[in-house]
Amino acid sequence: MEKEQILDFTRRISQSNRSGLTVINYEIIFAYLDDAKKAYQEEKWEEFKVALRKAQNSIGELMQTLDFSYDISRNLYRIYVFCKDSLAAAMYKRSLTEIENAEKMLRKLYQSFCK
């Protein structure tokens, strides 16, 4: 992630409410996935793993914010687990397919949180 992106995310986080933080967290995940795809193209496998781990950690942050008094949280939790597992598989296989599958699901959720 570029230094400017980090500064932008930091500024936005300091000015956001709870739902805004969720949206920003998704955007951080997408930035890390972009970093992983770039590292993959350049065959920089250590950077690839680091970016995927950071994306997994950000998904973990989303999981920690779930309120299980709502039924939808259980469904979101399962989706997040699937996405984390997909990124682990991508790391193990050195594959973009699993990244794209996880990103597709996360982008759909991101769109719903943006509304």
Enumerate the predicted regions with their spans:
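N-terminal intrinsically disordered, cationic/polar leader segments
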Residues: 1-35, 39-42, 46-52, 57, ...
